[in-house]
């Protein structure tokens, strides 16, 4: 049984399999294919030639453009057809030829995407990735399996991020970056392999950070990258900054999660 809201607009040239759940005011263009285990939230627009399959849940007010593929079998050779998922939030823009693969049992079973993200043309998001809110991945950006992007991350075009890497909030990665280690929050980085080039001050200004917060973040950055100290040696001083400026706490929380070491 197909569960399609009466207000949905579905092209007669689209294929919606039995069992799919289509919310109110959803639009589905011609030659798109929606699998039987897919759930699509209200006011999401799916343009022509989109394929969404697997156990995929898509929230409200998303826009998905031509030739995007969401929920397809992942490229992990260990995958044996388990009912793993893709879960996507609200108001995301998924542009042409984007691929988002379902998770693996070993990686938690879910590829998860938050709200208000923009994935430009040819972005690839592999199995078990976790993407926060308000991130931008520019054309041809590639995320390997198990990558985490926190909130407000910008990934420049033609960049690639290695498996299990964590990218902290408010990071700006320049185009063509190859990232094989974790990138702390607030950092600008670029290169092959990616290296830090300072604090993303322009991004912080746009998001309403005040001068005391940015000053404290810069001081923490200097301790990490310019003092000659190890992370373990720098942490006590960063903790002191965090007492007066909560924004610095992101550094401390990040170091607890980091498993691959940070870029240098």
UniProtKB/Swiss-Prot annotation:
Any one GO cellular component localisation term in the record: cytoplasm
Xref: Pfam families: Acetyltransf_11, Hexapep
Enzyme class: transferase
Catalytic reaction annotation: a (3R)-hydroxyacyl-[ACP] + UDP-N-acetyl-alpha-D-glucosamine = a UDP-3-O-[(3R)-3-hydroxyacyl]-N-acetyl-alpha-D-glucosamine + holo-[ACP]
Keyword annotations of the record: Acyltransferase, Cytoplasm, Lipid A biosynthesis, Lipid biosynthesis, Lipid metabolism, Repeat, Transferase
Compartment list: Cytoplasm
Coiled-coil parts of chain: none
One Gene Ontology term of the molecular function aspect: acyl-[acyl-carrier-protein]-UDP-N-acetylglucosamine O-acyltransferase activity
EC identifiers of the protein: 2.3.1.129
GO biological process, one term: lipid A biosynthetic process
UniProt KW Cytoplasm keyword: yes
Alphabetical list of InterPro entries matching this protein: Acetyltransf_C, Acetyltransf_C_sf, Hexapep, Hexapep_transf_CS, Lipid_A_LpxA, Trimer_LpxA-like_sf
Pathway: Glycolipid biosynthesis; lipid IV(A) biosynthesis; lipid IV(A) from (3R)-3-hydroxytetradecanoyl-[acyl-carrier-protein] and UDP-N-acetyl-alpha-D-glucosamine: step 1/6
Statement: the UniProt record of this protein carries the keyword Secreted: no
Subunit annotation: Homotrimer.
UniProt family annotation: Belongs to the transferase hexapeptide repeat family. LpxA subfamily.
Biological function: Involved in the biosynthesis of lipid A, a phosphorylated glycolipid that anchors the lipopolysaccharide to the outer membrane of the cell.
Protein name: Acyl-[acyl-carrier-protein]--UDP-N-acetylglucosamine O-acyltransferase
């Amino acid at each position: 049984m197909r569960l399609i809201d009466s207000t949905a607009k579905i092209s007669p040239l689209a294929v919606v399999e039995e069992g799919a759940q289509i919310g109110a005011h959803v639009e589905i263009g011609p030659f798109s294919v929606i699998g039987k285990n897919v759930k699509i939230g209200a006011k999401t627009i799916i343009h022509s030639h989109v394929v969404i399959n697997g156990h995929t849940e898509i929230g409200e007010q998303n826009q998905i453009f031509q030739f995007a593929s969401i929920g397809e079998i992942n490229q992990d050779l260990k995958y044996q057809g388990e009912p793993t998922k893709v879960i996507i939030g609200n108001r995301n823009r998924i542009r042409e030829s984007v691929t988002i693969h379902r998770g693996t049992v070993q990686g938690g079973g879910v590829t998860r995407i938050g709200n208000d993200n923009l994935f430009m043309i040819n972005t690839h998001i592999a199995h078990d990735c976790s993407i926060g809110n308000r991130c931008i991945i520019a054309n041809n950006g590639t995320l390997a399996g198990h990558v985490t992007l926190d909130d407000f991350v910008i990934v420049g075009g033609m960049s690639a991020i290695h498996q299990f890497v964590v990218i902290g909030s408010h990071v700006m990665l320049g185009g063509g970056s190859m990232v094989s280690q974790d990138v702390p929050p607030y950092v600008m980085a670029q290169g092959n392999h990616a290296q830090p080039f300072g604090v993303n001050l322009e991004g912080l200004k746009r998001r309403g950070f005040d001068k005391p917060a940015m000053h404290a973040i810069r001081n923490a950055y200097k301790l990490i990258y310019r003092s000659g100290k190890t992370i373990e040696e720098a942490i006590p001083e960063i903790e002191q900054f965090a007492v007066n400026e909560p924004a610095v706490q992101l550094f401390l929380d990040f170091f607890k999660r980091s498993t691959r070491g940070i870029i240098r």
